[in-house]
């Protein structure tokens, strides 16, 4: 199984969260190969200075090239909240799963409609760095639920 976490975020490892991301990638290896793809270019930076709508269009343009294969799931605070068991079902019986984390202005509705699903981790606002860690932990938890591993009790 292959899981991609595709995020609109400036590239580069931060000192605080990067070790946690690497930890979850490592412990997920018996179940799936997990990759994190960070996208942020001059076009996105410029668009964010113009307007929220321009920013969303630039995010869609950057993210759409990853929509071609697998199951595509956007993290969207306005979408259905899921618990860990519902999240695990999203991973079950899939060969490739792509998770999308939008930029500061979220997703265009058109991009969300191209995804197979959109889910929310709740109504709180999390930084991009932190939501990446939460997603990585939930991916590992979901994989362990699906494999009857004792991590989730």
Swiss-Prot record:
Catalytic activity: pseudouridine(1915) in 23S rRNA + S-adenosyl-L-methionine = N(3)-methylpseudouridine(1915) in 23S rRNA + S-adenosyl-L-homocysteine + H(+)
Sequence positions that bind S-adenosyl-L-methionine: 63, 102, 121-126
A molecular function (GO) term: rRNA (pseudouridine-N3-)-methyltransferase activity
InterPro entries (alphabetical): Alpha/beta_knot_MTases, RlmH-like, tRNA_m1G_MTases_N
Pfam families recorded: SPOUT_MTase (PF02590)
Alphabetically ordered keywords of this record: Cytoplasm, Methyltransferase, rRNA processing, S-adenosyl-L-methionine, Transferase
Entry GO CC: cytoplasm
Record SUPFAM superfamilies: alpha/beta knot
This enzyme's EC code(s): 2.1.1.177
Locations listed in the record: Cytoplasm
Principal localisation: cytoplasm
Family under the similarity heading: Belongs to the RNA methyltransferase RlmH family.
Function (record text): Specifically methylates the pseudouridine at position 1915 (m3Psi1915) in 23S rRNA.
Complexes and interactors: Homodimer.
Protein name: Ribosomal RNA large subunit methyltransferase H
Organism field: Sulfurovum sp. (strain NBC37-1)
Record gene name: rlmH
């Amino acid at each position: 199984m292959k899981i991609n976490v595709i995020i609109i975020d400036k590239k580069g490892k931060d000192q605080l969260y990067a070790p946690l991301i690497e930890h979850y990638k490592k412990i997920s290896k018996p179940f799936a190969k997990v990759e994190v793809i960070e996208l942020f270019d001059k076009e996105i930076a410029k668009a964010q200075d113009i307007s929220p709508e321009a920013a969303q269009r630039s995010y869609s343009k950057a993210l759409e090239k990853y929509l071609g294969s697998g199951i595509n799931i956007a993290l969207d605070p306005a979408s259905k909240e899921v618990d860990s068991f519902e999240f695990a079902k999203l991973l079950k019986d899939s060969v490739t799963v792509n998770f999308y984390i939008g930029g500061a202005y979220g997703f265009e509705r058109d991009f969300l409609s191209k995804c197979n699903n959109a889910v929310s981790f709740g109504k709180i606002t999390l930084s991009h760095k932190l939501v990446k860690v939460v997603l990585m932990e939930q991916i590992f938890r979901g994989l362990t639920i699906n494999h009857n591993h004792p991590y989730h009790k």
